[in-house]
């Protein structure tokens, strides 16, 4: 019984460390911009984006980074996790036509060591 209690306590103490090693990045889509406009992720490490929209329907997708087409709705959150396999700087443009400034709506993803 003591082993079970010790195991449970150890698990409870280590679980937050696992979450800390893989934090999510909050991104807000609004009319014609993403905030933040640039993010940095690490090569061969999972990255989770937590996306929401403050107005309008937007989307992201990147075959280079392995991000499937993801719709971002107002006042709700959607998460997408990907593992970058190549160093570099990538531009992700809004994947859903959202108005006059749609072509300027992008987020820069920097993949570093």
Locations of the language-model features?
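N-terminal, post-signal-peptide region of Sec/Tat-exported proteins
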Residues: 42-79
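Non-cytosolic beta-sheet module surface loops
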Residues: 31, 51-53, 84
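N-terminal edge beta-strand
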Residues: 21-46
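Positively charged n-region of N-terminal signal peptides that target proteins for export
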Residues: 1-5
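Extracellular/periplasmic metallocenter environments
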Residues: 26, 73-113
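N-terminal post-signal-peptidase region of extra-cytosolic proteins
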Residues: 30-37, 64-67, 75-79, 92-93
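Bacterial N-terminal signal peptides
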Residues: 7-16
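Exposed beta-strand and adjacent loop surfaces of beta-rich binding modules
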Residues: 24, 46, 57-59, 89, ...
């Amino acid at each position: 019984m003591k082993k079970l209690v010790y195991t449970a306590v150890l698990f409870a103490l280590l679980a937050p460390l696992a979450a800390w090693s893989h934090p999510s990045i909050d991104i807000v889509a609004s009319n014609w911009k993403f905030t933040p406009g640039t993010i940095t992720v690490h090569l061969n490490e999972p990255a989770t984006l937590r996306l929401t929209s403050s107005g309008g329907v937007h989307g992201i997708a990147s075959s280079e980074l392995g991000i499937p087409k993801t719709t971002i709705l107002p006042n709700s959150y959607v998460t997408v996790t990907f593992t970058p396999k190549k160093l570099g700087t990538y531009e992700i443009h809004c994947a859903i036509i959202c108005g006059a400034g749609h072509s300027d709506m992008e987020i820069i993803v920097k993949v570093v060591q």
